[in-house]
Amino acid sequence: MEIFSQKDYYPTPSSNVISYESDCVSKPVNSADLPALIVHLSSPLEGVDYNASADFFLIYRNFITPQDLHDLLIYRFRWCIREITTNAAKAKRRRIGEVALVRTFVLLRHSILNYFVQDFLPNITLRLRLIEFLNDKHIEQYPKIISSCIINLKKNWVHCSKLVWENIELNEPDKLDFDAWLHYSLKDFTQLESLHKRGSRLSIYARQSFASPDFRNQSVLSLYKTSDVFRLPEKLQSSNSSKNQRSPSMLLFPDNTSNVYSKHRIAKEPSVDNESEDMSDSKQKISHLSKVTLVSTLMKGVDYPSSYAVDKIMPPTPAKKVEFILNSLYIPEDLNEQSGTLQGTSTTSSLDNNSNSNSRSNTSSMSVLHRSAIGLLAKWMKNHNRHDSSNDKKFMSAIKPANQKPEMDAFVKYVVSISSLNRKSSKEEEEEFLNSDSSKFDILSARTIDEVESLLHLQNQLIEKVQTHSNNNRGPTVNVDCERREHIHDIKILQQNSFKPSNDNFSAMDNLDLYQTVSSIAQSVISLTNTLNKQLQNNESNMQPSPSYDALQRRKVKSLTTAYYNKMHGSYSAESMRLFDKDNSSSRTDENGPQRLLFHETDKTNSEAITNMTPRRKNHSQSQKSMTSSPLKNVLPDLKESSPLNDSREDTESITYSYDSELSSSSPPRDTVTKKSRKVRNIVNNTDSPTLKTKTGFLNLREFTFEDTKSLDEKKSTIDGLEKNYDNKENQESEYESTKKLDNSLDASSEANNYDITTRKKHSSCNHKIKQAVVRPASGRISISRVQSIAITPTKELSIVDPEQNKSNSVIEEISEIEPLNLEYNKKSALYSDTSSTVISISTSKLFESAQNSPLKQTQNPQREFPNGTSVSETNRIRLSIAPTIESVVSDLNSITTGSTVETFETSRDLPVPHQRIINLREEYQRGNQDIISNTSSLHELKTIDLSDSNNDLESPSTHAKNNKYFFSPDDGSIDVASPMKNVEELKSKFLKNESETNSNISGSVLTMDDIDINDTSSARNTRRANSESAFTGSLNKKNLNEIANMLDDSINDDPITVALMKLEGTYEKIPEKPENTKSSDAIGIKTSKLADEVEMLNLNNLPSFQNSPAEKRKSLLIERRRQTIMNIPFTPDQSEKEGFTSSSPEKIDVSANVDVAVQAAQIQELIGQYRIHDSRLMISNNESHVPFILMYDSLSVAQQMTLIEKEILGEIDWKDLLDLKMKHEGPQVISWLQLLVRNETLSGIDLAISRFNLTVDWIISEILLTKSSKMKRNVIQRFIHVADHCRTFQNFNTLMEIILALSSSVVQKFTDAWRLIEPGDLLTWEELKKIPSLDRNYSTIRNLLNSVNPLVGCVPFIVVYLSDLSANAEKKDWILEDKVVNYNKFDTNVQIVKNFIQRVQWSKFYTFKVNHELLSKCVYISTLTQEEINELST
């Protein structure tokens, strides 16, 4: 403190400790020591420069830590207090002290108000340091000027705390009560009693301040006057003479990554041109990537171009910008009409030779099919609609439309470009199109599609191999009539759904959500590979039943999302999963109901039909297959059931769509099922309702769809009609008799009203069923299962669990997906299992240990109202099953139609008939109690893959977890990593309070950031809640419900929150006594409930998500994945355990949340990197068929869409990354935007922008190189000149420079024949444009353009100039005297450059261009030629 009284610092710093720029009026600091800087900023004699203060707080972290800085400010403040209090007689000295005090106060207030999230929130020590200073014990003795300053800082601190933590109670006094504020003592969040911070959590403001570059940039600009226009410095003195040798190509294309400019490197894959050549001059290698910059939503949402063929060419004329546009042979009419997928294209017609809705696309020429773009389309469509070879080829064409994969179809539809070169009448076009020579297409766009299709093809091949092993070479057959009848209905539904990206909620960087599609396909491929490897390894051992089969079965059951299955006495119909176009955004926006995942079954032929008469079971011993976890972008396989005719064993089958890189293997079935067990299983299934089957035959992994409610209703009525024709009376009778027997035994054994069992119709082989499965957004898993058995009685006769077998865990240990904890959990709980159940339920015997605990029987059957007005009597037994059913995602029709939330997990495990649903009493009770608050829960986990469709989104499992006390069932098996139980457990640990709070509306309403958007209002949530309540209101007796809900449940082992949190900490151990005796765990539950609250309040596990609406989720996956790497910051102190808060270090959070994602990302990148072109139509030897797609569009449209893309990418650059120059000096070597998309999580915003810039330059050069004729080259070059001219008008300097650099490249300049043909007007424009990147006077032309921008037009700045300046400036020293005198000028120059950049990026918000998804997709998903191909074509 004494330092501020020394003569070098009092009253202002002397030239010994500070120096100023001599030639500037504002006297900016050139160099200074740290105390002198503080004195300068709080100078009592000079005017206050608020801009200089704001700049200081942006850059000080480069030379002093926040803690040291605030210590200095506190010392300065206390020095001022001493000056005021000890110099009462010296008026002048006292006056100087007062002015310095106020100015120091301004600095502290600025820091608290604007950098609370960045500096204080992650640093508990700093927070406590400042709180200690503000809680000054002597505040009452100070003069009012001092106490007023301190009280003002206290108020600011309270304000910021409330801004950062929602619902925090600080008990601060009234704002005007001066005396109360004098005595008010601040407390840190961690020092509050748990009562006062209950329900609090990090706010949207806090999260965006961490993770959203755009929000952070806006916050910085808000510190300055809006009238300020920052300018780039005209002069930059670099200490390195290499600056004089720089050239534009050096700046933009460092040798190591450019495809076009690298002459000495042999690369198998072309690398991205890197704009940061200047940065390679700087020897400072930045080792870590930015954790803040992310791909913006605009780019990510861009649709793939639908066709890779050029539609039209615009005519070049002597006048500028008169363009001749190619007519498109491939613009599907349904693209604009939103009606269907590819049926408007030539794809299906080329396969079935039938007339098509697009007359121009018709073709009957096989040469077209094989040699032209149409052949490629046919190949891709076949890939989407992969069918088993045993299918009757005659009906392939009818099947196609129903099985297509909408997101892949849309990708092809939007990206593909096919054109005709000459303007003709439509009839002439049609005739010419039949000649394959005239059909030209954009080969580069087609390569982008083929890159994804190759993944899809690989997946199909793997499925085929897995099925071959599983089916033991059994060739399933298909009942053609049934299939045909089914497809007629399918096609009708298909016409109602269409994939169309939203114009409001999309990411221009990935408008077709390709990142999500590719991620899910890649996950599927990885899982299938693991499955296949395990199958091959275990082939011989699988010949005998494994001793740990029971444990494995239990694990599989736990992985099931739905426990429904459909049995037809001994006959499983072969099923063909149909893909419906689920992309009609219009049909989605009207309902909030969850998507329906539909499967349709067709039947096997007569060989199977014979078995219909006898209710025997079949064995499904195929290995468990883990398919793609595509949230919406993937389809399930057409899997036919494999069952040897003479086998009567029971088995559980499941297909897990897992994002986990490892897939569990399956083990062989066992023959331990009693006859009675089979009977029970036959009885319990009601086949009137939609059911789910696992299939092993068909090869299309992607054939599932999400249906809207309307189409499902129509389908149900259709199916009901069809089913009536196939009723089998004989089976009905035998079914009914066994039902009665079972009822008697149930009454005798359990005393429970467990009447879930209803008579069911029997159907012959021509059944038409809707198959449903649950998609779990939180984990990105889709699980399909046939449940092994149902726990409805505690009778030992049903037991199929052998404790002796379960003692062996050899097979389980091989399954790397299972955590050691879960293994322990599994082994111990299995030993205590006295029920046959391996489904997720609590056995009756465990629920009701005594007659006293059993519920009273209902005297009346509860009534259930249905939308059609009918009231259906429910069975009068209590539902004990708590298996997660399809109902947990697909709510009842009446609740969907009211837009309400989905039902709880405690719904009936048996599929309901269309007009009847059995309601769990506990569920009914809890609905009433909790007001269905949980309906606001949505996607939660960091690792989540967005499963939303274009405008619809699935409810989260945690919705039901809140209501389901019995969801965690230790006595039935382990909670598997891949299981929904595990997912819900994780979600509960993150988002639910301890049990005592779950019945309170307020504390139970835990919204995640996914659910809250900035614009979200509580009224919307209240409306949803009201809908839910009205939808679920039933006529059940509340008193009886109350009794049932309050019954003891002895089967719960631990508080699930406790278990989850202990697992998170690695301290969980299963209590080694019987699961029934669980009271010993109560103490642990109480002890850790505080921890659960803290985790919830701070939301440590789910920091990086901000979207809430389904439409927002449409674009969020890419952004969410990028954001998720940002916030690995500890928000709570390790040392505050005495307050009941344990450590939540970033390591723990990071490990639990991000390890999986990192492993997956690396595997996906490797998969994409393995792509090689095999199709001759896509090779450069076929360049005579190439026409760039830009010739199909006018240059104005192309410029607008390119501007939207660049705007979003530059919006991902964070001011701090730019200031610190956080970037790689060697960009990734990629040849397509897809390859960049899958790497985006590892790239900072700067790296992403540079890579995109270089990719675009390479793409422009590649388009010109691939074009064969000089005339066509001329057209392409002219079109790019026109686009560049429009970009200059739009002030989109990034795209402008991309085009200029590409056209200026030596490769393009070689084509003198083409340049000679260019129109004079366009040559004049080109002469003007190519002066812009001139090196004269330090890029003065581009600097003048950037400094003279009109903000209202919008602006996309040329990032390379800024990076060049920052790199040159980085060569200066940080310190003039090491750790004493800082080179302040260096940092001040940096901040001026950064402010200029982020200001111009913010001006891009003034663009009002309309999105053209087809063109945007083509512009986003670009590919380039490889290094070798460029060399070959340019020589």
From Swiss-Prot:
<dbReference type="InterPro" id="IPR036964">
    <property type="entry name" value="RASGEF_cat_dom_sf"/>
</dbReference>
<feature type="compositionally biased region" description="Basic and acidic residues">
    <location>
        <begin position="723"/>
        <end position="744"/>
    </location>
</feature>
<keyword id="KW-0131">Cell cycle</keyword>
<keyword id="KW-0498">Mitosis</keyword>
<dbReference type="GO" id="GO:0005886">
    <property type="term" value="C:plasma membrane"/>
</dbReference>
<dbReference type="Pfam" id="PF00617">
    <property type="entry name" value="RasGEF"/>
</dbReference>
<keyword id="KW-0963">Cytoplasm</keyword>
<feature type="domain" description="N-terminal Ras-GEF">
    <location>
        <begin position="25"/>
        <end position="157"/>
    </location>
</feature>
<dbReference type="GO" id="GO:0007265">
    <property type="term" value="P:Ras protein signal transduction"/>
</dbReference>
<feature type="region of interest" description="Disordered">
    <location>
        <begin position="723"/>
        <end position="747"/>
    </location>
</feature>
<dbReference type="GO" id="GO:0016192">
    <property type="term" value="P:vesicle-mediated transport"/>
</dbReference>
<dbReference type="GO" id="GO:0005933">
    <property type="term" value="C:cellular bud"/>
</dbReference>
<comment type="function">
    <text>GDP-GTP exchange factor for TEM1, a Ras-like protein, component of the mitotic exit network (MEN). Activation of TEM1 by LTE1 in the bud ultimately leads to activation of CDC15 followed by the release of CDC14 from the nucleolus, which then inactivates cyclin-dependent kinases (CDKs) activity by several mechanism. Required for TEM1 localization to the bud cortex during mitotic exit. Fine-tunes the timing of the mitotic exit and couples this event with cytokinesis.</text>
</comment>
<dbReference type="InterPro" id="IPR001895">
    <property type="entry name" value="RASGEF_cat_dom"/>
</dbReference>
<dbReference type="GO" id="GO:0031536">
    <property type="term" value="P:positive regulation of exit from mitosis"/>
</dbReference>
<comment type="similarity">
    <text>Belongs to the LTE1 family.</text>
</comment>
<feature type="modified residue" description="Phosphoserine">
    <location>
        <position position="1028"/>
    </location>
</feature>
<feature type="compositionally biased region" description="Low complexity">
    <location>
        <begin position="237"/>
        <end position="249"/>
    </location>
</feature>
<feature type="modified residue" description="Phosphoserine">
    <location>
        <position position="689"/>
    </location>
</feature>
<dbReference type="InterPro" id="IPR019804">
    <property type="entry name" value="Ras_G-nucl-exch_fac_CS"/>
</dbReference>
<feature type="compositionally biased region" description="Basic and acidic residues">
    <location>
        <begin position="582"/>
        <end position="606"/>
    </location>
</feature>
<feature type="region of interest" description="Disordered">
    <location>
        <begin position="582"/>
        <end position="689"/>
    </location>
</feature>
<feature type="region of interest" description="Disordered">
    <location>
        <begin position="338"/>
        <end position="365"/>
    </location>
</feature>
<feature type="modified residue" description="Phosphoserine">
    <location>
        <position position="808"/>
    </location>
</feature>
<feature type="domain" description="Ras-GEF">
    <location>
        <begin position="1194"/>
        <end position="1434"/>
    </location>
</feature>
<feature type="region of interest" description="Disordered">
    <location>
        <begin position="851"/>
        <end position="871"/>
    </location>
</feature>
<dbReference type="Pfam" id="PF00618">
    <property type="entry name" value="RasGEF_N"/>
</dbReference>
<feature type="region of interest" description="Disordered">
    <location>
        <begin position="235"/>
        <end position="256"/>
    </location>
</feature>
<keyword id="KW-0132">Cell division</keyword>
<feature type="modified residue" description="Phosphoserine">
    <location>
        <position position="1109"/>
    </location>
</feature>
<dbReference type="InterPro" id="IPR000651">
    <property type="entry name" value="Ras-like_Gua-exchang_fac_N"/>
</dbReference>
<dbReference type="GO" id="GO:0005737">
    <property type="term" value="C:cytoplasm"/>
</dbReference>
<feature type="modified residue" description="Phosphothreonine">
    <location>
        <position position="691"/>
    </location>
</feature>
<protein>
    <recommendedName>
        <fullName>Guanine nucleotide exchange factor LTE1</fullName>
    </recommendedName>
</protein>
<keyword id="KW-0344">Guanine-nucleotide releasing factor</keyword>
<dbReference type="InterPro" id="IPR023578">
    <property type="entry name" value="Ras_GEF_dom_sf"/>
</dbReference>
<feature type="modified residue" description="Phosphoserine">
    <location>
        <position position="559"/>
    </location>
</feature>
<comment type="subunit">
    <text>Interacts with CDC24, CDC42, KEL1, KEL2, RAS2 and TEM1.</text>
</comment>
<dbReference type="GO" id="GO:0061510">
    <property type="term" value="P:asymmetric protein localization to new mitotic spindle pole body"/>
</dbReference>
<feature type="compositionally biased region" description="Polar residues">
    <location>
        <begin position="621"/>
        <end position="632"/>
    </location>
</feature>
<dbReference type="GO" id="GO:0051301">
    <property type="term" value="P:cell division"/>
</dbReference>
<feature type="compositionally biased region" description="Low complexity">
    <location>
        <begin position="654"/>
        <end position="667"/>
    </location>
</feature>
